[in-house]
Amino acid sequence: MLPTSGSSANLYSWMYVSGRGNPSTPESVSELNHNHFLSPELQDKLDVMVSIYSCARNNNELEEIFQELSAFVSGLMDKRNSVFEVRNENTDEVVGALRAGMTIEDRDSYIRDLFFLHSLKVKIEESRQGKEDSKCKVYNLLCPHHSSELYGDLRAMKCLVEGCSDDFNPFDIIRVPDLTYNKGSLQCG
């Protein structure tokens, strides 16, 4: 369950922490902290988008937030590509790293925006329960193709926030962003 207010008080009470004491690395984190939670501006944006989506009566109204969300996702992927790099792609030694000149603050900014996207997806899924509306372009933005980098990052974020599912090895350390998702010698299309 996501927090309903913008305050950072007792945020860990609603979140599963999978880090098991494993330290974060410069390029990724195994636990979320106050640097990753929504800023008041992002919380307001989340509330407005969820409200518009929840109150929509048809697909045209559902698409009202599509342009803004599409730009946000595009900016998020641009940020990911400018902050991080993948080395030894298509090998068993694939690793992710911060690009030269990038800082932990840049990493945290990406994770915060990713947390916004995860939160929006969860809230929209909650608002869709019991509705017969067809999935629209907004929902499709929030559910990227399984071979994409964004899918891997959202999957890892979900595991940190909600707890791991069966598609994760229980002994794996979950890291956000998941820079090596679908980048090794074995890939899915």
Curated annotation (Swiss-Prot):
GO terms for cellular component: extracellular region; host cell cytoplasm. Changing G189A: Abolishes interaction with CASP4 and CASP8. Strongly reduces CASP9 binding. Reduces inhibition of host cell apoptosis. The keyword tRNA processing does not apply. It comes from the Bacteria. InterPro entries: NleF (IPR031829), NleF_sf (IPR038334). GO terms for molecular function: peptidase inhibitor activity. Keywords: Host cytoplasm, Protease inhibitor, Secreted. Residues 186-189 are annotated as: Interaction with host caspases. It is found in: Secreted; Host cytoplasm. Effector protein that alters host cell physiology and promotes bacterial survival in host tissues. Inhibits the catalytic activity of human CASP4, CASP8 and CASP9, and thereby inhibits apoptosis of infected host cells. Monomer. Interacts (via C-terminus) with human CASP4, CASP8 and CASP9. This is Effector protein NleF. It comes from Escherichia coli O157:H7. The gene is nleF.
